[in-house]
């Protein structure tokens, strides 16, 4: 689920792990979700939201695992906690405090969920990655994310893809299920349009305003029939159909579908496959502007390829 460490000398080796739905309500379950990734490397920093940081720290204490904790607005700027971190190699840090405390580069990072402001996540990854290249080392990233967090799943999948990490099957399936890219939706709409355009639609003669030629029963003085004269066909009564399912065949068994209904159907398909606007709230991740958060960010990376 990550890059092969033999293929590069520095950078990030990322893995994503599934968090069960119940993990959001139990302190012990929060700890159990990250237990297997603690202590695998010499130094580890657990990154989480402010409310979770205290709970995880208390759980570590109960497990007799000495650790440091970094929060925003610490009295001494976190000097004492930094000293403990150099000694024990394990720290719990809130997302808001990560940029303030200026911790040294760790061997591994555990993201327990993503920041509530998901825009901060790619910026944090870029900062860690930049330091890893500078120190010429591989840093391990473990991301524990809930399967119910649609936006977080989408952001994580793009970060894995952009760094050529293997995207787990369950992540890819969730992205397709919950966060189908707009390009796929537009492609589906075009396929529907092409399919409908290839189906011939019968057009009645009356619709073309054509007239039928019928022989006249009037005879001349000599008794010979007179030349036929064009007689307009009887005008058919228009039937207004509210739905395509109400259309019935004519006397010849043919169906005539009004053009307006075809256009209506295409427009309805547009609505059916258009992206859900409810997902595009103010908290949704802005992928196009993600590259501008850091002056050193490689603008060659794109989130939608």
Curated annotation (Swiss-Prot):
Residues annotated as signal peptide: none
Residue span of region Disordered: 211-233, 267-305
Composition bias type Acidic residues, residue spans: 268-287
Expressed in which tissues: Expressed throughout the male and female germline.
Record-level GO cellular component terms: nucleus
Bias (Basic and acidic residues): 289-305
Disrupted gene: phenotype observed: Mortal germline (Mrt) phenotype in which there is a progressive decline in fertility with each generation at 25 degrees Celsius, and after 2 to 3 generations the brood size is 25% that of wild-type counterparts. Fertility in these mutants may be restored when transferred to a 20 degrees Celsius environment. Defective RNAi inheritance.
GO biological process terms on file: regulatory ncRNA-mediated gene silencing
Annotated localization: Nucleus
Primary subcellular site in the record, as a coarse category: nucleus
Keywords recorded for this protein, A-Z: Nucleus, RNA-mediated gene silencing
Nucleus keyword on record: yes
Transmembrane segments: none
Compositional bias of kind Polar residues: 215-227
Chain's role: Plays a role in germline RNA interference (RNAi), and in particular is required for piwi-interacting RNA (piRNA) gene silencing. Facilitates the binding of the argonaut protein hrde-1 to small interfering RNAs (siRNAs) targets that are required for transgenerational epigenetic inheritance and germline immortality.
Name of the protein described by the UniProt record: Protein hrde-2
Organism: Caenorhabditis elegans
